[in-house]
Amino acid sequence: MESNEKIQILSDLIQFDSRNGNERPVAEYLKALFEKHGIEAEILPLASDPDHRANLVAHVGTGKPVIAFTGHMDVVDFDRSQWATDPLQLTMDGDKMFGRGVSDMKSGLAAAAIALIDIKEKEIPFDGTLRFLATAGEEVGMAGSTALQAAGYMDDVDALIVGEPTGYNTSFANKGELNITLSAKGKAAHSSTPQLGINAIQELMDVWADIKTKLDERSQKDTNQYLGQDVYNIDVINGGSQPNILPANAEAQLNVRTVPEFDNEAVLAIIDQAIADFNTNHKGEVSREVTMEIIPIEGDLHSKLIQKMQAIAKAAVGKDIKAIAAPGGTDASKLLVDHPIGFPMAVFGPGNFLTAHQNNEECSKDMYLKFIDMYTELFTTVSTEY
């Protein structure tokens, strides 16, 4: 496949407005692309919205080992007025390519798809099966990867490659994440007689103070040598209607990033105990709801997969390739829910992570094309290690 065709495939993907909730057209495009080149692919609609949301699974080869690549088809939202170019058009400026998703992560998706096509058409020999998993909804909720894991598509996988943007590095671990809504019910009263009511905002402040104290104590003790410690913030708070009415209801949204040593379950246990203690000793009522959850993942830093990635990338770019831990989550947290520690998993993909989710998102054209070649070599050689 010529370079201009490789760029055109990425351009085609950028043109799909796949802001979370509209991934099926991307899946249909990839299915047609694969089938044009003799690769069988299957669209798997999501039950929640089958007309607009779907995963895609494709295979090349048969038998063991099974090497899986995963990448997501959705992108984050954008404001056209804040972009220097059309975010739904791939725009070139020298080596820079601009467009929503060009780094996160349609360049990785396109590069892996093209690598499979090259392997198929050139009949490059390899052992086992290459499985391509294109997911819906990674940016919000990870519904696609959750569905693929539940359907058994990870049951026989021996190693997992995640195509999120790392540039010329690779990542083997990421923090987990919890989004938690804290809700407080109080009693309205005139602000001049607060003793007649229950201030719901104050309830939240008191509960959060207790939660934070306990989280601080635990997080300082139970750290991870690669990921550090848990971090947590209240990012949204709502309550009250006007200055002279004691608020009867209040709500706060809490974001927590977790490490294996102080994981989601342990964090929720602390929060639940703090809420129970508060409700026992106060007239108001506080509750919590988990609105999003992914677990922390720690792959094997010394795996054959990472060693192979580092060797291939060093040969391509002439420098040592770092294996790092990342604070952000990926679909691996859902795909590896049954074995989150020690599995041969690595994140390795084209793009500039610093511009992901930003206005004027960009990716290097040279990096994108190099990753196609690196994926082709990786996909066809790493299977000998498993």
Locate predicted features.
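Acidic/His- and Gly-rich active-site-bordering loop/insert found
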Residues: 1-98, 121, 126, 332, ...
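Metal-dependent amide/peptide-bond hydrolase catalytic core
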Residues: 179-386
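Acidic-glycine-rich active-site phosphate/pyrophosphate-binding loop
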Residues: 78-93, 156-157, 172-183, 311, ...
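Glycine/charged-rich beta-loop-alpha catalytic/anionic-binding loops adjacent to active sites
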Residues: 87-101, 185-186, 314-317
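Residue-level signal for inorganic ion chemistry
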Residues: 13, 17, 34, 164, ...
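Fold-level recognition of mixed alpha/beta catalytic cores in primary-metabolism enzymes, strongest
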Residues: 102-103, 107-213, 359-370
